[in-house]
């Protein structure tokens, strides 16, 4: 009798939300992700001879990555496709190819031959404004850097992100673009309308995309202006559907072996992990923490003295909304099992880059980033068989420096 009274008392003490979480949920058979980007490209004139060597990220245009994962095995050879609306101007459908994953060769040693400790320093700045703030820069000397210092210096902001479909996470997997179809998305292409995913290893997925979940507006920079104090004032047009903005810049220091980095965050943050899709709830949190700029922001000034040369790259991202769907909807009866057939995530971002440079008389070297003036987009590169893992703190000094030196051409 006492045990029954105690159990009843415990149940009464539990809050209603906790009691409601007792509904049994079976995970979806299929998970479908659409990663949709509008890339503004380089908001500047390209020096002769360099345009052909520019990576796809600098060329601008609309891009899309489609990933389908399923817990079902394929009946015969795996095949699936995404039937698209006519407004996308890419035919009736896009093939979701299942990549042939080859076993990686066995490494005979855990050592990493060929790694040479870099020379020079990294100078880390942050914050918008005319002048550098007290306590900056944080200086990292590669010659004396140990893994613990690297972990502190290169630690990125913790972001809560779901993990999308990938060959290692799904029994059967399909992706686009791929080796059979890597067509570029037309400049006027639109996602608005009805979509259907079908195949021999997935339940049929049907959904509609509205205006807010279509490709975001391209980021358009105004002329970069050098202030009387030597700072670089960068302005951009407001992106209507943006949930927030973030910017980073990098360049060479006065010493040729020095790398200078800056971010728009109000607190110390290198920001490399933030230059990607981020869920809206996380963007809201980062705005409260003064890491991400609110969506009404239209300008940021890189402080004077951060970049001494006019060869520094300014990278910018406008975060977009997400469309998240589950089929069938959750039963209202908590005793009924929620057997999910499929889930969909459509995530959005708009990116651009420009040089922190100005001509005499206040005219920036180049022009604003605008899709109307760009050439036809290049074909999208097919994705690798699996998504790369985020580097561990112990790898930060190696991977971070390799990436930055590669960008700077050293």
Question: Which residues make up each language-model segment?
Answer:
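Glycine- and small hydrophobic-rich membrane-insertion segments that are intrinsically disordered
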Residues: 39-59, 68, 72-74, 270, ...
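Exoplasmic/lumenal beta-rich domain surfaces
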Residues: 253-303
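Solvent-exposed N-terminal domain segments of exported/luminal and surface proteins
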Residues: 24-178
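Proline/serine/threonine-rich low-complexity linkers at boundaries of modular beta-sandwich domains
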Residues: 204-216
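Conserved aromatic anchor
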Residues: 232-241
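Short, aromatic- and glycine-rich surface loops/edge beta-strands on solvent-exposed regions
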Residues: 181-204, 309-323
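Sec/Tat signal peptide C-region and signal peptidase I cleavage site
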Residues: 16-22
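Exposed aromatic-hydrophobic patches
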Residues: 182-185, 298-306
């Amino acid at each position: 009798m006492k045990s029954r009274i105690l159990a009843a008392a415990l149940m009464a003490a539990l809050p209603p939300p906790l009691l409601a979480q007792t509904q049994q949920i079976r995970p979806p058979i299929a998970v479908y992700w659409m990663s949709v980007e509008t890339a503004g490209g380089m908001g500047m004139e390209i020096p002769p001879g360099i345009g052909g060597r520019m990576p796809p990220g600098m060329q601008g245009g609309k891009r899309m990555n489609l990933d389908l994962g399923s817990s079902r095995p394929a009946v015969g050879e795996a095949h699936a496709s995404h039937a698209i609306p006519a407004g996308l101007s890419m035919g009736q459908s896009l093939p979701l190819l299942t990549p042939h994953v080859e076993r990686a060769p066995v490494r005979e040693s855990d050592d990493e031959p060929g790694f040479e400790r870099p020379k020079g320093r990294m100078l880390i700045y942050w914050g918008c404004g005319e002048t550098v703030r007290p306590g900056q820069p944080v200086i990292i000397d590669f010659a004396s850097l140990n893994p613990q210092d690297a972990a502190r210096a290169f630690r990125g902001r913790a972001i809560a992100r779901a993990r999308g479909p990938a060959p290692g996470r799904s029994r059967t997997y399909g992706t686009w673009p791929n080796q059979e179809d890597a067509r570029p998305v037309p400049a006027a292409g639109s996602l608005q309308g009805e979509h259907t995913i079908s195949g021999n290893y997935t339940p049929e997925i049907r959904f509609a995309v509205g205006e807010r979940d279509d490709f975001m507006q391209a980021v358009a920079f105004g002329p970069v202006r050098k202030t009387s104090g030597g700072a670089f004032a960068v302005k951009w047009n407001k992106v209507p559907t943006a949930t927030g903005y973030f910017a980073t810049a990098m360049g060479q220091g006065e010493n040729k072996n020095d790398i200078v980095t800056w971010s728009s965050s109000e607190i110390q943050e290198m920001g490399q992990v933030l230059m990607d899709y981020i869920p809206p709830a996380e963007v809201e949190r980062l705005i409260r923490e003064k890491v991400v700029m609110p969506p009404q922001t239209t300008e940021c000034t890189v402080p004077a003295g951060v970049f001494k040369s006019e060869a520094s790259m300014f990278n910018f991202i406008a975060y977009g909304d997400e469309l998240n769907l589950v089929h069938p909807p959750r039963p209202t009866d908590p005793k009924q099992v929620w057997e999910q057939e499929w889930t969909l995530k459509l995530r959005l971002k708009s990116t651009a880059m420009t040089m922190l440079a100005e001509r005499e008389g206040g005219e920036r070297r180049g022009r604003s980033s605008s899709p109307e003036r760009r050439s036809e987009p290049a074909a999208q590169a097919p994705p690798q068989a699996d998504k790369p893992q985020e580097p561990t703190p112990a790898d930060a000094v190696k991977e971070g420096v390799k990436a930055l030196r590669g960008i700077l051409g050293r």
